[in-house]
Amino acid sequence: MPNLRIVSDNAVSRAATLVASTTAGGLAAANLARDTKSNVHRATGTSVTYTLTWVAAEPIGCVALPFCNLSPTATMRVRAYASNGTTVLYDSGAGLACPAPALRPLGFTAAQAASAYAYGGGACARRWFSQVNAFKLVIDIVDTNNLQGYVEAACLVVGATWSPKYNASATSVSVIDRTEISRSAAGDQLADPGTISRKVPVDLRAMPEADRARFLDMVRNSRAYPVLLSVFPEDADLALERDFTIYGRRTKDSDIAYQFLGAYATTLEIEEI
């Protein structure tokens, strides 16, 4: 089982161009560069191609759409190019984008749940690969079984990955339900449904010096910048991978403690955007 992986620097924010092959109305591709799940890009049909370019080479080892309406049979193909825009550095071929089905919150139809990002619905498409330094990226998505009849995504994450030498010693996932419970004057219990999101903390123990330095570089960045965390990347248990993959912000500062003989420990906690 691979160790956890983190993308802490989203290269989409530095892209010179971000273009979608088709766009429905005003739901523009530029929304993919926003760190929100309420602003989406929507294609006109069940396939779309995203093309990104950069002025300088970007290290890339992951492409993810953490909030999308793709079905379990949707495919994603990622191609990375050199500076001339024609030399292929990496080609994933067409593979399943998010084989674990989207969760279906109570009260939603299957089609509605596919894009119920604020209530625990939606899917997370991802592709992990050996890092390349690319000037251009092309992402092809095909989802002929899409329940809504079009491809939709709220965020695009592209960047280098970091994985510690030793995996997390402990982790959990919390479902944060903002429903408010109250009582009426007649004594009845009332519920005002709220949004739902997740929080995933991970404990890292016995980090060697190289991991300590890399982790410290990461947390020196403001908590304003979201990170993509996958505790069980490419795991055979697809639901486990889905449930412990999260795109969000650090909820608190991370102390790095010296343990013994050059080994360090810390805790990282991410709450979904």
Roles of regions detected by a PLM:
Residues 1-48, 55-273:
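Extracellular/virion structural assembly segments
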